[in-house]
Design a protein with these regions (language model features):
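Extended, subdomain-level signal for the structured scaffold at the beginning of enzyme domains
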Residues: 1-96, 186, 190-219
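Short, glycine/charged-enriched secondary-structure capping and boundary segments
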Residues: 18-20, 42-44, 102-105, 136-140, ...
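A short, terminal or domain-edge coil/loop segment
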Residues: 82-91, 114-128, 175-188, 219
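Class I SAM-dependent methyltransferase SAM-binding "motif I" and its flanking Rossmann-like core
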Residues: 100-103, 108-174
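Conserved anion/nucleotide-ligand pocket segment
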Residues: 159-202
Length: 219
């Protein structure tokens, strides 16, 4: 299992990501964590601030968008799509919306199987990293679990993907609007004695191997 979990965007260790995916890699970008934001605002952000497709192209990675809504109730089609790429990259946004999308498309089941066979790399930042953990408990201090875009199941999915065995707090002590909320989440996890990793923007976790037998680097 190969994971690249970042606090913000690609982080400061893109070379480690390239080492995971290899030369000439193909990536699928999952942006469903932003489905509560109007399309025009999302397009303006990509045009004016950050375009993940361009960011990956600068690394020699060919990327395209993968909208999980197109695969709601169609796990076989989703698996076929994911088998055609080397990396799936989950963008930041609302962690609960992203987790709903992963449940309704069966991404959670498909990605676990592909990772178990080392057929793909899972990467993501902020919400994309948070959902890789065992539980989203505490994340409600950073993201609103009751924001429900059209077409989404209103039930909150609290279970994470359990790709790692600890919680992740992004934007910790960082120049980011959610830094104060991140501190509150970290404090709550510490009070509950829940294992967690707090990541500052720029920091990443590179995870190689099974959870029980893993090589992990905090970069």
């Amino acid at each position: 299992m190969r994971l690249y979990l970042s606090s913000y965007r690609l982080g400061d260790s893109a070379g480690a990501l390239l080492a995971l995916v290899g030369n000439g890699a193909r990536a699928a970008i999952v942006s469903n964590a932003l489905d509560h934001i109007p399309a025009a605002a999302r397009e303006a952000y990509r045009a004016e601030i950050s375009d993940p497709i361009a960011d990956f192209a600068a690394l020699g990675i060919s990327a395209q968008d993968l909208d999980l809504q197109h695969y709601f109730g169609a796990p076989d089609r989703l698996e076929n799509a994911l088998r055609g790429v080397d990396l799936v990259w989950a963008m930041g946004g609302n962690s609960f919306i992203l987790r709903r999308a992963m449940a309704q498309s069966a991404f959670d089941t498909v990605i676990t199987e592909l990772l178990a066979h080392d057929a793909i790399v899972y990467g993501g930042f902020s919400a994309g990293a948070v959902v890789a953990t065992p539980s989203l408990s505490g994340v409600e201090l950073m993201d609103d679990p009751n924001v429900i875009p059209p077409g989404y199941d209103p039930a909150v999915v609290w279970e994470g993907l359990s790709l790692v065995d600890y919680a992740i707090v992004p934007h910790f002590d960082s120049p980011h609007p959610e830094s104060v909320a991140a501190r509150a989440m970290a404090n709550q996890l510490a009070k509950r004695k829940t294992p967690f990793r707090a990541l500052r923007d720029g920091e990443v976790i590179v995870h190689i191997g099974k959870i029980s037998d893993t090589k992990e680097l905090a970069l």
